[in-house]
Amino acid sequence: WIMGHMVNAIAQIDEFVNLGANSIETDVSFDKNANPEYTYHGIPCDCGRTCTKWEYFNTFLGGLRKATTPGDSKYHEKLVLVVFDLKTGSLYDNQAYDAGTKLAKSLLQNYWNKGNNGGRAYIVLSIPNLDHYKLITGFKETLTKEEHPELMDKVGYDFSGNDDIGDVAKAYKKAGVTGHVWQSDGITNCLLRGLDRVRKAVANRDSSNGYINKVYYWTVDKRASTSDALDAGVDGIMTNYPDVIADVLSESVYTAKFRIATYDDNPWETFKN
């Protein structure tokens, strides 16, 4: 999965997919009542990027729905996965459940079109704080209450705080999550980070009793760091330059082992090295 980083304006969906992304990451900020409000990152952000592009969250979902609904004039067949980077740092811990509830209602209405031919992309809810695991509970219980539990088949999870892998496993246990787990590791492109924790995550994925289904690394903009991540066995790379990742993947050393995921590839299924 080539994951376009910080896609927060509708116009950027086309831009990143046209550069080779089959997945995008979108920032979601919340108001003080835990409503998802804007797709917005803010300053500071990755080096070389404009930090302030934004839409209202529900407006963005409308654009995303069009981009992922077959038959729509804006449809991109290859856009198959969306990571919502949930900026829950602005919330109190006791608001996490509410945030999950409100997020589910927004997606149900504006993305899934109440279950009637809505957008088809798989969704990863990426949460920066292990203490906010109840966001997952709120999300799940709301879709059940709204009589669309089947949409949970399209939803996966990520804790993005670079926490100890054992601690992440405990948070999933509390949230009752037993699958659909993506594990991120990374740092802003302005700084360097080694691959030690990525290798631990890959080892967990490849073990017989691990909780991780997929591992992705962020934010990778250079050919050398792309090769290093691929050599470590990741499933996804988040980038500001999808064309760079696509180019490295086309090298003969990688074409034998990697290909770009399509809609038929289940993102919750573990593919071991």
UniProtKB/Swiss-Prot annotation:
The molecular function terms of the Gene Ontology recorded here are: lyase activity; metal ion binding; phosphoric diester hydrolase activity; toxin activity
- Which residues act catalytically here? 5, 41 (nucleophile)
Instruction: From the record, give the cysteines joined by S-S bonds.
Output: 45-51, 47-190
Q: Which Pfam families match?
A: GDPD_2
User: Tissue range of expression?
Assistant: Expressed by the venom gland.
Give the UniProt record's GO annotations in the biological process aspect. killing of cells of another organism; lipid catabolic process
Q: Which GO terms describe its cellular component?
A: extracellular region
Q: Which UniProt keywords apply?
A: Cytolysis, Dermonecrotic toxin, Disulfide bond, Hemolysis, Lipid degradation, Lipid metabolism, Lyase, Magnesium, Metal-binding, Secreted, Toxin
Residues where Mg(2+) binds: 25, 27, 85
Q: What is its subcellular localisation?
A: Secreted
State the free-text cofactor note: Binds 1 Mg(2+) ion per subunit.
Catalytic activity entry: an N-(acyl)-sphingosylphosphocholine = an N-(acyl)-sphingosyl-1,3-cyclic phosphate + choline; an N-(acyl)-sphingosylphosphoethanolamine = an N-(acyl)-sphingosyl-1,3-cyclic phosphate + ethanolamine; a 1-acyl-sn-glycero-3-phosphocholine = a 1-acyl-sn-glycero-2,3-cyclic phosphate + choline; a 1-acyl-sn-glycero-3-phosphoethanolamine = a 1-acyl-sn-glycero-2,3-cyclic phosphate + ethanolamine
Q: Which co-factors does it depend on? A: Mg(2+)
- What top-tier enzyme class does this entry carry? lyase
Provide the E.C. number(s) assigned to this enzyme. Answer: 4.6.1.-
Stated family = Belongs to the arthropod phospholipase D family. Class II subfamily.
Q: What does this protein do?
A: Dermonecrotic toxins cleave the phosphodiester linkage between the phosphate and headgroup of certain phospholipids (sphingolipid and lysolipid substrates), forming an alcohol (often choline) and a cyclic phosphate. This toxin acts on sphingomyelin (SM). It may also act on ceramide phosphoethanolamine (CPE), lysophosphatidylcholine (LPC) and lysophosphatidylethanolamine (LPE), but not on lysophosphatidylserine (LPS), and lysophosphatidylglycerol (LPG). It acts by transphosphatidylation, releasing exclusively cyclic phosphate products as second products.
- Protein name, entry field: Dermonecrotic toxin LsaSicTox-alphaIB1aii
Q: Give the species this sequence originates from.
A: Loxosceles sabina (Tucson recluse spider)
